[in-house]
Swiss-Prot record:
Family: Belongs to the carbohydrate kinase PfkB family.
Organism whose genome encodes this protein: Arabidopsis thaliana
Listed pathway(s): Glycan biosynthesis; starch biosynthesis
GO MF annotation, one: fructokinase activity
The name this protein goes by in its record: Probable fructokinase-1
Length: 325
């Protein structure tokens, strides 16, 4: 799909990998009769989500100089994502993840990264011109786990911020990748006060606050003065939003979920694409609620197919879905 050249650029930083998804839901990895190869990785999913919706996006990260790595770069290009920020590592493989799909479409992960190419991105390999051209710079926390990628992440954030980009953060907690829960929490929170938009899931809210109450009081313990929008996604219960001046909830759409992979990324991509050229939406509750309803629809549609990227909807698909609701 051709990207809209007039739109502001959304640059997504981090990992892209291959998810191996069982062909049968509700079985363990050992019992799975076969696996479907599905490209994924939250930051890459967000970049493709933006492009599918008619926006402009670029991906910054490192892939293995192997068949899987070149396949993933090709998928980004095919989906209209700028690939000038991609590096290839000749010494490390592209990351793999085996995903267990429970009967309700939710997931558990087993990762193969020892180390994978994405972990080896160095600050001197960053395409700084591309990063400086971002109107929105989006990232997760997996790139904070080890050096040198952590330093590359911090440098990219700093360069984007100095150039005037809006910083967007989705921690995308994957506990098995961290040395410990304490380290995960420390590192996720180490860059917390830099982001102007933060999206967490209900599970991440519980993890970061230590509270099992998913309510406004708990969510607002994560508020910081630089924030423009804090979002808590509640899966089949919709989402909650918090700004400096207002807060509220947006109802979900009920669909037959088969795989929740990529739903949060689809939600984030939709949100960023709607605000990249008009940040005033963040200060207008009525308009923000419309944007979040659209984002909820994107997330819901994404759960109705297996794999993240194949399931990310186009703008026309979302509008058609909303017309029927």
């Amino acid at each position: 799909m051709a990207s809209n050249g007039d739109k502001g650029l959304i640059v997504s930083f981090g990992e892209m990998l291959i998810d191996f998804v069982p062909t049968e839901s509700g079985v363990s990895l050992a019992e799975a009769p076969g696996f479907l190869k599905a490209p994924g990785g939250a930051p890459a999913n967000v970049a493709i989500a933006v492009s599918r919706l008619g926006g402009r996006s670029a991906f910054v990260g490192k892939l293995g100089d192997d068949e899987f790595g070149h396949m993933l770069a090709g998928i980004l290009r095919k989906n209209g994502v700028d690939d000038q920020g991609i590096n290839f590592d000749t010494g490390a493989r592209t990351a793999l993840a085996f995903v267990t799909l429970r009967a309700d479409g939710d997931r558990e992960f087993m990762f193969y990264r020892n180390p994978s190419a994405d972990m080896l991105l160095r600050p001197d390999e960053l395409n700084l011109d591309l990063i400086r051209s971002a109107k929105v710079f989006h990232y997760g926390s997996i790139s904070l786990i080890v050096e040198p990628c952590r330093s590359a992440h911090l440098k990219a954030m700093e360069v984007a911020k100095e150039a005037g980009a809006l910083l967007s953060y989705d921690p995308n907690l994957r506990e098995p990748l961290w040395p410990s829960k304490e380290e995960a929490k420390t590192q996720i929170m180490s860059i917390w006060d830099k982001a102007e938009i933060i999206k967490v899931s209900d599970v991440e809210l519980e993890f970061l606050t230590g509270s099992n109450k998913i309510d406004d009081e708990t969510a607002l313990t994560l508020w910081h003065p630089n924030l423009k929008l804090l979002l808590v996604t509640l899966g089949e219960k919709g989402c909650r939003y918090y700004t400096k001046t207002f807060k509220g909830a947006v109802d979900p759409f009920h669909v037959n979920a088969v795989d929740t992979t990529g739903a949060g990324d689809s939600f984030v991509g939709a949100l960023l694409n709607q605000i990249v050229d008009d940040r005033s939406v963040l200060e207008d509750e009525e308009r923000l609620r419309k944007v979040l309803r659209f984002a909820n629809a994107c997330g819901a549609i994404t759960t109705t197919k297996k794999g993240a990227i194949p399931a990310l909807p186009s703008d026309a698909e979302v509008r058609s879905f909303l017309e029927k609701k």
